[in-house]
C-alpha cells in the first residue's frame, strides 16, 4: 500500500478471546477492540511517550527475571531503546520521532526513574514483604481460563510465606480526575481483578494482594472481592460473545460496520480514527471540546500553493469553504504529489492557526488520500 492512501474499511475478523489488558477497550468501543485484537495496523502514529513506556515496561520485566543490575542497566537501556527506535524507523508514520531522546522531553527523567526502581529491587519485592529466600517471582506468567476465552500475561507473580501477590507494571498515567480527587483508573483495577480470577482458575487459590507499580516506583494496592472478580469475568465474556455475534451478522454487509463503533471525544486517542465511519459521523455532528488543540478534517482536494521552501500549502474544500493547511513538507507527506482535483482527503492531528483562518501541521499530523 502506498504511504498515505486510506483504503475502504473492512469488517474485522470475529474475536474469540479477550485479554484482561484489553477489557477496557472492549468496554469503550467494540470496533476498536476488534481491530486491535486482530492486529490491524494503526493509521496514526503512537505517541513517542507510549514508545518510551513500552521500553520501560520491558526493562521492568527483565528486572523481575534478575537480568538487570545497576552495572548493566545503561547497556540494556540503550539496547531496548534501539529496538523500539528500529520499529519506529520502519514506519512512515513514526520514523520522524526517532531518536526518542529528542521527541520525548522527559526521556532522561524517565531513564533516571527506571534506574532508581532497578536499584531498589534487591531491597524488597513490595512495600510490605522484604525480598528474602522464602519469596519467589514468576515474571511474565501466562494465565488462562478453563475455556481459554479469557487469557493474558501478567507481569509478575510473587509468592511469599503469606500468599501470592499479583503485580502489574504501568508506565503511563494511572490516576484519573474525579469529584473525589485523583482515583485509580477503573480499567486498571478491572485488569488486575481479572488476573486474580485467572490465577484462581489455574491454581485453585486467590492471591492475597493485587498491586500496580508505577514508573515512579509507587506501589498501589488494589483491594478486591472474590465475587466481584467472578462477576467481572462473566460480564467480560458475555460482552465478547455479543461483539462476536454482531460482527458475524455484518459479514455480508460491511457498510453496517458503523454499528460497532462507540464514538465520542475519547476517540482523540484512537489510532483507527481515519478509517472509522462512526467517528467521522460523530465528528461532523459534534463540536470539539473547549481547549482542544488537535483537529481532524475531511474535504476535497482543491490544489497546492508554494510556501517557503521546502513547505507547501494544501487547499481543501470543506462544506463549501476553502480551507488552507499550512507548512506541509512533501518528504513527510508523500501522498501530496498523488492528489488530483476533487480527491477525498483526510487530515488528522492538525493544529488551528492563531487567526483561526487556517490549519498548521507538525510531526503528529497525518495526511491521507481516501479511496
Residue ranges of model-derived segments:
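A non-catalytic, helix-rich entry segment at domain boundaries
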Residues: 59-139
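Nuclease catalytic cores
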Residues: 20-70, 272
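Flexible glycine-rich surface loops and low-complexity tracts that mediate binding to linear polymers
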Residues: 299-300, 335-366
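Structural detector for short beta-strands of small beta-barrel domains
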Residues: 287-315, 347
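Short, acidic/hydrophobic/Gly-rich beta-strand patch recurrent on exposed beta strands
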Residues: 166-168, 311-319
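Beta-strand/loop nucleic-acid-binding surfaces
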Residues: 317-343
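Metal-dependent nuclease catalytic regions and adjoining charged, substrate-binding loops involved
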Residues: 197-287, 359-371
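Mg2+/Mn2+-dependent nuclease catalytic core
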Residues: 133-233
